[in-house]
Amino acid sequence: MPFFKIEQKRLPFNHICRMKFYSYATNNTLSPNSSHVLKHSTSTDMVYIKQLYNTSCSRYKCYPIFDEYQSIYIHSSKPGVYESLIIMENGIRKGVLTYVVNDMMNYKYRVMEIVLLLYEGTDYTDLFKQINKHCRAKKIDAILCLNIGENNKFIKKFNFVPGFDTYLYMYNYHINGTLRPSDILFNFI
C-alpha cells in the first residue's frame, strides 16, 4: 500500500500515526569505546539483513514488505546520498543502520536522516556514540530521526531536540484509532 507523510499540519482526514521529528547536532564529541564498528554493507551482508529485518518485523504493526530487489536497493549504499551500515559489536554483526543524506542550504549543512535502525544488542549508548563519530567523519552536521522503532532508545538519553510533528497516511485507507510511533518500524521517506 502506498504511504505518504505530511509534515507539521495534518490533513482533514484520519492519519495512521502522528510522529515527531527529533534532531541532534553532531558537533558534540562523544567518545565511543571500541566495541562497536560501523561498516558499509556488502552483498555478503544481505542474507543477514533480510533475516534480521524479517525477525524484527513481528514486533511492529506497520512496516514495509520488501521483495528481494527492493531489499538490496534499500540496504546498499551510494556514498553521500544514502548508506546502509552494518553494526559490528566485538566483531559480530549485530544490526543495520540505513540513512539518507540531505544537503541543506547549498551544501553548507548536511543532515543524516535515519530510515531504519535494527539492533540486536543492548548498548544503545555506545552505538549512538559510534553513529555520532561516523557523522563527524562524514562531515554530517545533524542527525534527524522520527520517534519510531528503536530510535527512542537514544532520543531521550542524548537529549535530541524535538522538532515538528509529521503524520503518516495511506491512500484510500481508513482505520479507527491510530498507531503509536513505537508501532512503526520504517521511516517512509
Language-model segments: what does each one mean?
Residues 1-34, 74-75, 83-85, 89-90, ...:
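Active-site/acyl-donor-binding loops of N-acyltransferases
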Residues 52, 70, 130-131:
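Short, hydrophobic/aromatic alpha-helical segments in well-folded domains
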Residues 56, 70-72, 99:
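Sparse, context-dependent recognition of short Cys/His-centered cofactor- or disulfide-binding micro-motifs
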Residues 24-67, 111-113, 186-189:
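Short amphipathic alpha-helix that is part of the acyltransferase structural core
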Residues 63-81:
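Active-site rim helix/loop that mediates acceptor-substrate recognition in acyltransferases
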Residues 56, 60-63, 78, 138, ...:
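Short secondary-structure junctions and interdomain/linker hinges
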